[in-house]
């Protein structure tokens, strides 16, 4: 077995929830402020998932006070406490960049049955 592949297997998280573009997720992130650590929740729509192995990342978008906020998270990061799937979305694209130009009801995504 390849040495790099075996090292990646050791570092990878085992309890990852299955989700994809269009899904609404709630990401619990550990944030260090001064000397204390707390959990910050970031909820939004997954607009892309890229890479593979340890370098896999996903981008979550939400609108906060009328301003679009996008955050990219490494999937296997130790800073991510857990990922919850709130809703499964029905989309036909792997990259949902078109949501950046939509506002209000136009930016809604259908639920998967």
From Swiss-Prot:
Keywords: Ribonucleoprotein, Ribosomal protein
Stated name of the protein: Large ribosomal subunit protein bL19
GN (gene name): rplS
Gene3D superfamilies found in the cross-reference section: 2.30.30.790
GO BP annotations listed: translation
GO molecular function list: structural constituent of ribosome
Source domain of life: Bacteria
Job description of the protein: This protein is located at the 30S-50S ribosomal subunit interface and may play a role in the structure and function of the aminoacyl-tRNA binding site.
A single Gene Ontology CC term: cytosolic large ribosomal subunit
Organism this protein belongs to: Pelotomaculum thermopropionicum (strain DSM 13744 / JCM 10971 / SI)
Family: Belongs to the bacterial ribosomal protein bL19 family.
